[in-house]
Curated annotation (Swiss-Prot):
Regulation: Strongly inhibited by Ag(+), Co(2+), Cu(2+) and Hg(2+).
GO terms (BP aspect): alkaloid metabolic process; nicotine catabolic process
UniProt family annotation: Belongs to the flavin monoamine oxidase family.
Temperature and activity: Optimum temperature is 35 degrees Celsius.
Name the UniProt record assigns to this protein: Pseudooxynicotine dehydrogenase
Subcellular location: Periplasm
EC number: 1.4.2.3
DNA-binding found in the keyword field: no
Record pathway: Alkaloid degradation; nicotine degradation
Length: 497
């Protein structure tokens, strides 16, 4: 079994120790509150009167393993279909790789944050629940850009810097329409995708006749998109984000880092759960999933649950931590072993000074700063709140304010850091990474296979979405589709019984 004895996982943290508090985590270290949506470990919703499952030999029609946006969406769709549904979540909260928390009493998003109308699934939900939107100003509309090239720091008005960067982007993205003419249908131009999918983001960059300055700015951008070093990121992944943004750079800036939910991503989760009669059980890691032709048995440390179908809605990098019987397909096992590339750092930094709306670029490897990008979230009474990214968590401890201040000084000389805060998703045994970024070759080799059901076992998640993979939108896309598939499957089975 995977970690059923509290064994140490390959990243050095067991799931049992994580839940037991041996890993303090960023929230405790920074002295801030955890995510608002934290239900009791008993099944939320279990006190409601409900019709029993369709089959007499099971406890639930469907069990959803994983309580991120994909899992919650799938569970909502299943419960809407009249199916008795349980969500099992290993953490003590819902939300997956989204995490609404606080820094100095102010709301921050430690994981997934931004939404946009180019992301139709999440935008529909935001509008449906009447949630308000606010803006992050620094990335999409900076006044000043600071960049590192050849280990030298440059500074210029945004318009001047974007002339350099924009010309590089025009060259880099020139194949995007050929690869993804219909970006929500990733294999529509399958031959073109296959020809380019094996390239890394850095390999393609090195093919281009750009200046050193342009390549350094692009390296920063690629690292920020993929949350790792560019050689680990598939070139096709970079093209996908651009295609989904209507093949337009200003729209891409707005789509990936401008608009966010004013009340936090947690408020969208709360609304989705409230509209459903799903049951939710937290702090319940799943150890084993065993299926036969009649039902699925899910084993946790608390016992065994029987269901007619199971939705695996866990991050790709944790898929292999559950024991499956029969074992998963070779393709799923292979990519679960490889993992996706998203492994970087995201953090919030509060400084005393008002530095205005700034944006910084630095290649993932440089001698100046560990931050590939830093930009203004907003300027307030207590100074400026910045959002910072790094390709490698080994380069900077985002929760060490002194280290963060030292890393900022080459970019913003003299600033005083009063607090800094981030969450190491790599140490979290229920994520083992940040947002999903496919490695070279993984899209064409594994995406279709990841989406295939295996018997009574279905698979959902942002990590296997067709469109905005790695975003909240992709999670909702996948969860909705799989919820519909499972409902159709179960009702079809029942009607034919």
């Amino acid at each position: 079994m995977a970690n059923d004895k509290g064994d140490i996982s390959k990243d050095g943290v067991s799931r049992r120790k994580f839940l037991g508090g041996a890993v303090i985590g960023a929230a405790a270290a920074a002295g801030v509150g955890s995510q608002i949506l934290s239900l009791s470990a008993t099944a939320q919703g279990a006190d409601k009167e409900r019709v029993g499952p369709l089959q007499s030999n099971v406890d639930y029609d469907a069990v959803v393993i994983g309580g991120g946006f994909a899992g919650v969406t799938a569970a909502r769709e299943l419960s809407r279909s009249g199916l008795k549904t349980l969500v099992l979540e290993g953490r003590s909260r819902l939300g997956g790789r989204t995490f609404t928390s606080k820094l100095d009493g102010e709301k921050v998003e430690l994981g997934g944050t931004w939404v946009h109308w180019t992301q139709p699934n999440v935008w529909t939900e935001v509008m449906h629940y009447g949630l308000e939107i606010e803006e992050t100003v620094g990335l999409a509309s900076p006044e000043t850009v600071i960049w590192v090239t050849d280990n030298q720091v440059k500074r210029a008005p945004a318009a001047e810097a974007f002339e350099i960067f924009g010309a590089a982007c025009t060259e880099y993205y020139k194949e995007a329409h050929n690869i993804y003419p219909r970006p929500f249908d990733p294999f529509f131009a399958k031959k073109a995708l296959q020809e380019m999918d094996g390239l890394s983001a850095s390999e393609y960059l090195n093919k281009l006749s750009l200046t050193r300055e342009q390549k350094d700015m692009m390296d920063s951008w690629l690292s920020g998109n993929g949350h790792n070093y560019p050689e680990t990121i598939a070139y096709s992944e970079i093209m996908r984000w651009f295609a989904l943004s209507n093949f337009n750079m200003p729209t891409m800036f707005d789509s990936i880092a401008r608009y966010k939910i004013k009340s936090g991503t947690v408020s969208l989760l709360e609304a989705m759960v409230a509209e459903s009669d799903m049951e939710v059980q937290l702090s319940t890691p799943v150890l084993k999933v065993k299926q036969d032709s009649h039902r699925v048995l899910i084993t946790t440390e608390e016992g065994t649950i029987a269901a007619s179908a199971v939705v695996m809605a866990v991050p790709l990098n944790t898929m292999g931590d559950v024991e499956y019987s029969p074992r998963l397909s070779d393709a799923k096992s292979e990519i679960a072993s490889q993992g996706h590339a998203g492994k970087g750092v995201k953090g919030y930094i509060r400084i005393k000074q008002d530095v205005g709306n700034v944006m910084t670029y630095a290649p993932a490897r440089n001698d100046v700063t560990p931050f590939t990008s830093v930009f203004t979230d907003h300027v307030g009474e207590n100074g400026t709140l910045l959002i910072a990214f790094s390709a490698d968590p080994k380069l900077v401890d985002i929760n060490d304010s002194k280290a963060v201040e030292k890393a900022l000084h080459p970019l913003l000389p003299g600033v005083e850091v009063t607090s800094s805060y981030g969450y190491d998703w790599n140490l979290d045994p229920f994520s083992k990474g940040t947002w999903c970024t496919y490695r070279p070759g993984q899209t064409t080799r594994y995406l279709t296979e990841l989406q295939k059901r295996e018997g009574r076992l279905f698979f959902a998640g942002s990590d296997m979405a067709n469109g905005w993979r790695g975003f909240i939108d992709g999670a909702i896309e996948s969860g909705r589709e799989v919820g519909y598939q499972v409902a159709s499957y179960l009702k079809g089975k029942n009607s034919n019984a």
